[in-house]
C-alpha cells in the first residue's frame, strides 16, 4: 500500500474527460480491463419493481426465489429477537437448567449447537477472535483519576471475575484483558461509578459487560414487587440497563451479552425503534434481566407500562457523548431522573465513549457519584495501526477514483462512507453494475434490510459496505481492512470515528479519504491527526494549511475539535468548576445545546440526526 497514491495518480483518475461525474465516458476502469462483460445485465425495472440502493440483494432474491433476499435469510429478527434466541442458554434459561436456587447460581448444561452459534467454530479461519492482536495493547498508556482507585488486574482470573463468566470468556478466545478492561473490571466490582474514555476497538463493551455479569451472577435476581405479579400487570423488571444511541450498536451489545450470559440465569433483551414494538414487548414479558435499549424506544415502553426501572442496579451509557450530541439528553434525563429508577446513590452508573469533552463531563456529574475517570490511550485520536492516506479528488472524478482504488487494492472487507442516503444508494448501484458485491445501510432502510446487509458484510458475502453516518460510531465489524471516505465529514471527530472501523482490536488497517476544495474546513484537524499518528502529510494539505493560516480562516473543524486535547482529561484535576467531592444542583429541565459551550450547534439537519423518523428511535 506504500505506493498506492502513485498507482492512483498513474491511472489518471483526475482527468475530467474520464467522466468521473457521470455521462458517457471512454474511461475503462482497471478492474474491467482484464474482465469480460458483467455476469448480468441490469435492465430498467418495471415501475412496481423499482427499489433503491443495495437492490443487489432483492434482485438476486427474485432470481433465486428466496424471500429473504440474495442470501436466503428465511426469517427476520422482528425487533432484534428471533427464534434463534430462544433455543437455550441466555435466552431460554428456565428450560435449559440454568437457574438461581436458594441463593446459589446453578449453570445450565452445555449446548454444542448453541456454542457454535454464539462463539463460532474455533478452527474456522474467519473465526472472529482469532485475529485479535492482544499484545499490541501492552504499551497503551492508561490514566485513572479519582479517590481510592483500585489496582488494575493483569489477566482474566476468578476472583474478581465469576467462574462461569471465565468459561465464556475462554470460549470467546479472549486471552488477556485490554487496558480499559484491566481497570474497569476492578473498579466496577468494587462498586464504583466510572467514566471511561477509550479509542474505538479497545474492548469497551467487555469493559462494562464483564464486571456487570460477574456481579449479577453472584447476587442473583431482584424480587419482583408483589403488585406486579398478576398477569394483567406483567412488565419487565431488569436489573441492568444499557443505553445506546443506535439500533445497530444496541444489537451489537445484545449479541455480546448473549455470549457471556451463556448457561447463566441472566436473560438479555434488546429494544429499539424501526422494528415491531409488539414483538419486543413479548420478549420483555418472557423475562428480562439485562435490557439493552435506545432512548426513544425505551421511553415508549415506559409510557406503555411494559418496563419498570425500579430494580435497576447498573446503568450503562455507551457512546454517551454521541447520544447527547444527537439530542437524546431530554429522553435520557426522563429515563434516569423522572421514572422509577433508583437514585444515583442507590445504583452504579458507567459511562463509556471514545470522547468526553469537558462540557460533557460537566453534564455527566448529574448521573455519576464519586466516580473514577479512566482515560485509555490518546482519546480522540486515531490509532497508529491505521495507515491514513489523503488523496485529492474532485467530486466529478470520485467514481473513477473509487474504481481505480478498489482495483489497486481490494482485499478483505471495504467500508465506504458517504454523506447522504441518496449517495449511498447511488454508489451501491454503481458498484453492483461494475460487478462488485456491494450493499448499503442508512436510515431509510428497513430493519430487516439493514440486518441482512450487515450480516452479509460480516460474513464476507458482500465485501463492500456503503454507509452513512448511522454506522460511523460503535459498530464492531470484524476484519474491515480498508475504510474509504468517499465523502469527508465536516466534523473532524466524525473522521476519527469513521476510520476507527478498521485497525480494531490491535490489528492493522488502511483508511483512504477523497479530499477536495469542499473540505478545507477540516484541514487543520487532518494535519494534527496525521502528525500525531506519525502519518505522511500530503503536500497539497500542507500548502492549504499555510494558505489558511495566512488568510485567517476558521480551522476548528466543528464539533468537539476545539476541546480534543481536553477530551481525555479529568476536568476535576485540570480545571473547571468542581472537585472530586463536589456536587451541583440537578438540572431537571430540558437543555438547549446551543447555549452550552464547546462547539455544540444544531447540526442535526446536516448529519441526518434531526429526522423525527430516524431509525434509532
From Swiss-Prot:
Where composition is biased (Polar residues), the residues are 7-17, 79-90, 580-594
Q: Compositionally biased, Basic and acidic residues: which spans? A: 38-58
Q: Where is this motif: DEAD box?
A: 318-321
Instruction: Name the SMART domains on file.
Output: DEXDc, HELICc
**Which UniProt keywords are present, listed alphabetically?**
ATP-binding, Cytoplasm, Helicase, Hydrolase, Initiation factor, Nucleotide-binding, Protein biosynthesis, RNA-binding
Give EC number(s), comma-separated: 3.6.4.13
Q: Which top-level enzyme class is recorded in the Swiss-Prot or TrEMBL entry?
A: hydrolase
Q: What Gene3D superfamilies does the annotation carry?
A: P-loop containing nucleotide triphosphate hydrolases (3.40.50.300)
The record's Pfam families line, in alphabetical order, gives: DEAD, Helicase_C
Please indicate the residue ranges that the annotation assigns to the motif Q motif.
154-182
Family matches, as InterPro entries:
DEAD/DEAH_box_helicase_dom (IPR011545), Ded1/Dbp1_DEADc (IPR044763), Helicase_ATP-bd (IPR014001), Helicase_C-like (IPR001650), P-loop_NTPase (IPR027417), RNA-helicase_DEAD-box_CS (IPR000629), RNA_helicase_DEAD_Q_motif (IPR014014)
Q: Which residues form a coiled coil?
A: none
Give the GO cellular component terms, alphabetically: cytoplasm; nucleus
One annotated GO molecular function: DNA/RNA helicase activity
Q: Report the residue ranges that make up the Helicase ATP-binding domain in this protein.
A: 185-374
Q: Which SUPFAM superfamilies match?
A: P-loop containing nucleoside triphosphate hydrolases
Q: What exactly does this protein do?
A: ATP-binding RNA helicase involved in translation initiation. Remodels RNA in response to ADP and ATP concentrations by facilitating disruption, but also formation of RNA duplexes. Redundant to DED1, may be required in conditions in which DED1 expression is decreased.
Q: Which family does it belong to?
A: Belongs to the DEAD box helicase family. DDX3/DED1 subfamily.
What this protein is called in its record is ATP-dependent RNA helicase DBP1
Q: Which lineage?
A: Eukaryota, Fungi, Dikarya, Ascomycota, Saccharomycotina
Amino acid at each position: 500500500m506504500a505506493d498506492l497514491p502513485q498507482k492512483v495518480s498513474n491511472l489518471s483518475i483526475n482527468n475530467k474527460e474520464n467522466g468521473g461525474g457521470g455521462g458517457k465516458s471512454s474511461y475503462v476502469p482497471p478492474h474491467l480491463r482484464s474482465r469480460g462483460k458483467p455476469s448480468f445485465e441490469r435492465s430498467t425495472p418495471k415501475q412496481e419493481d423499482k427499489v433503491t440502493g443495495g437492490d443487489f440483494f432483492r434482485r438476486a432474491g427474485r432470481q433465486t426465489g428466496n424471500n429473504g433476499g440474495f442470501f436466503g435469510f428465511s426469517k427476520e429478527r422482528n425487533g432484534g429477537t428471533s427464534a434463534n434466541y430462544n433455543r437455550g442458554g441466555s435466552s431460554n434459561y428456565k428450560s435449559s437448567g440454568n437457574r438461581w436456587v436458594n441463593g446459589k447460581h446453578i449453570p445450565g448444561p452445555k449446548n454444542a449447537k448453541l456454542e457454535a452459534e454464539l462463539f463460532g467454530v474455533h478452527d474456522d479461519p474467519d473465526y472472529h477472535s482469532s485475529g485479535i492482536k492482544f499484545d499490541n495493547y501492552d504499551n497503551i498508556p492508561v490514566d485513572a483519576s479519582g479517590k481510592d482507585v483500585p489496582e488494575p488486574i493483569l489477566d482474566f482470573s476468578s476472583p474478581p471475575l465469576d467462574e462461569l463468566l471465565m468459561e465464556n470468556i475462554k470460549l470467546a478466545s479472549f486471552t488477556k484483558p485490554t487496558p480499559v478492561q484491566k481497570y474497569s473490571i476492578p473498579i466496577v466490582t468494587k462498586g464504583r461509578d466510572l467514566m471511561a474514555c477509550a479509542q474505538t476497538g479497545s474492548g469497551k463493551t467487555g469493559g462494562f459487560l464483564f464486571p456487570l455479569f460477574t456481579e449479577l451472577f453472584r447476587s442473583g435476581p431482584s424480587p419482583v414487587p408483589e403488585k406486579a405479579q398478576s398477569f394483567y400487570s406483567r412488565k419487565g423488571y431488569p436489573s441492568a440497563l444499557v443505553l445506546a444511541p443506535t439500533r445497530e450498536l444496541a444489537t451489537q451489545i445484545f449479541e455480546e451479552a448473549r455470549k457471556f450470559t451463556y448457561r447463566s440465569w441472566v436473560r438479555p433483551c434488546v429494544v429499539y425503534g424501526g422494528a415491531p414494538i409488539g414483538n419486543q414487548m413479548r420478549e420483555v414479558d418472557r423475562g428480562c434481566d439485562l435490557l439493552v435499549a435506545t432512548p426513544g424506544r425505551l421511553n415508549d415502553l415506559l409510557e406503555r407500562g411494559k418496563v419498570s426501572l425500579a430494580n435497576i442496579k447498573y446503568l450503562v451509557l455507551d457512546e454517551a457523548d454521541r447520544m447527547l450530541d444527537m439530542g437524546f439528553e431530554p429522553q435520557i434525563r426522563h429515563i434516569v431522573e423522572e421514572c422509577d429508577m433508583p437514585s444515583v446513590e442507590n445504583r452504579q452508573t458507567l459511562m463509556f465513549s471514545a470522547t468526553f469533552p469537558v462540557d460533557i463531563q460537566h453534564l455527566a456529574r448529574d448521573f455519576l457519584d464519586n466516580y473514577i475517570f479512566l482515560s485509555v490511550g490518546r482519546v480522540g485520536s486515531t490509532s497508529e495501526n491505521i495507515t491514513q492516506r489523503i488523496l485529492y479528488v474532485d467530486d466529478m472524478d470520485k467514481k473513477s477514483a473509487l474504481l481505480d482504488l478498489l482495483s489497486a487494492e481490494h482485499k478483505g472487507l471495504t467500508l465506504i462512507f458517504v454523506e447522504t442516503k441518496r449517495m449511498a444508494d447511488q454508489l451501491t448501484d454503481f458498484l453492483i453494475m461494475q460487478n462488485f458485491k456491494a450493499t448499503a445501510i442508512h436510515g431509510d432502510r428497513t430493519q430487516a434490510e439493514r440486518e441482512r446487509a450487515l450480516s452479509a458484510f460480516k460474513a464476507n458475502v458482500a465485501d463492500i459496505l456503503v454507509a452513512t453516518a448511522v454506522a460511523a460510531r460503535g459498530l464492531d465489524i470484524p476484519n474491515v481492512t480498508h475504510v474509504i471516505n468517499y465523502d469527508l465529514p465536516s466534523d473532524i471527530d466524525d473522521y476519527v470515528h469513521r476510520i476507527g472501523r478498521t485497525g480494531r482490536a490491535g490489528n492493522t488497517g488502511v483508511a483512504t479519504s477523497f479530499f477536495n476544495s469542499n473540505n478545507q474546513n477540516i484541514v487543520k484537524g487532518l494535519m494534527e491527526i496525521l502528525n500525531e499518528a506519525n502519518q505522511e502529510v500530503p503536500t497539497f494539505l500542507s500548502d492549504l494549511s499555510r494558505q489558511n493560516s495566512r488568510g485567517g480562516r476558521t480551522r476548528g473543524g466543528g464539533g468537539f475539535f476545539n476541546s480534543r486535547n481536553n477530551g481525555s482529561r479529568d476536568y476535576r484535576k485540570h480545571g473547571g468548576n468542581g472537585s472530586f467531592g463536589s456536587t451541583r444542583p440537578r438540572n431537571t429541565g430540558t437543555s438547549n445545546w446551543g447555549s452550552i459551550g464547546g462547539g455544540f450547534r444544531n447540526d442535526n439537519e446536516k448529519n441526518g440526526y434531526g429526522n423525527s423518523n430516524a431509525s434509532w428511535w
